[in-house]
């Protein structure tokens, strides 16, 4: 694939970056994208009351003078870097949940593997890991439905 095709592919991949991506990184990507697609800044700086537009304009202005090819290459590199950081953070978070907090995976609609410990472990999971997407689902499960699920520990 050529640089243009790679750039278009990574312009789509950027949409899958986590919401926790910093505004600074988003602005860097914005500036590189604009430089790669439009070229040098061709508008005047937005007024002081348009802070968001002003920050975006400043990010674009910061990469002024780069060739379109260089901006595309830098954009691809930055997206790869952010994807790697997100994957590493996810792995660390998962290892923490599994190792430190003894979190287990719970699937609804299958036969029980650990009938005796299910309710106790499920309660521990809800207490230890509030706020995760999985817990939002598990918090809706009534203890009387424990027999339709199974639990298994990671590791």
From Swiss-Prot:
Keyword Ion transport: no
Compartments where found: Cytoplasm, Cytosol
Family in the record: Belongs to the ACBP family.
Tissue expression per record: Highly expressed in leaves. Expressed at low levels in roots and seeds.
TM ranges: none
Its job: Binds medium- and long-chain acyl-CoA esters with high affinity. Can interact in vitro with linolenoyl-CoA. Binds phosphatidic acid (PA) and phosphatidylcholine (PC) in vitro. May play a role in the biosynthesis of phospholipids.
Record GO biological process: fatty acid metabolic process
UniProt name for this protein: Acyl-CoA-binding domain-containing protein 3
UniProt cross-references to SUPFAM superfamilies, sorted A to Z: Acyl-CoA binding protein
The keyword Nucleotidyltransferase belongs to this UniProt entry's keyword annotation: no
Keyword list, A-Z: Cytoplasm, Lipid-binding
Domain of life: Eukaryota
Sequence positions that bind an acyl-CoA: 15, 30-34, 56, 75
Induction or repression: Down-regulated by cold stress, wounding and infection with the rice blast fungus Magnaporthe oryzae.
Gene Ontology MF term list: fatty-acyl-CoA binding
């Amino acid at each position: 694939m050529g640089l243009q095709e790679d750039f278009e592919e990574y312009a789509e991949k950027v949409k899958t970056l986590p919401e926790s991506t910093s505004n600074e990184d988003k602005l860097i990507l914005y500036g590189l994208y604009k430089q790669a697609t439009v070229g040098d800044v061709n508008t005047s700086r937005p007024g002081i009351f348009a802070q968001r537009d002003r920050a975006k304009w400043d990010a674009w202005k910061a990469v002024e003078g780069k060739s379109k090819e260089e901006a595309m290459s830098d954009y691809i590199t930055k997206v790869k870097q952010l994807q790697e950081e997100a994957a590493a953070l996810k792995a660390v978070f998962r290892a923490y949940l599994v190792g430190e907090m003894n979190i287990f995976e719970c699937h609804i609609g299958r036969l029980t593997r650990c009938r005796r410990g299910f309710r106790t472990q499920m309660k521990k999971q809800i207490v230890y890991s509030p706020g995760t997407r999985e817990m939002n689902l598990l918090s809706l499960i009534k203890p009387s439905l424990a027999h339709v699920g199974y639990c298994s520990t990671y590791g």
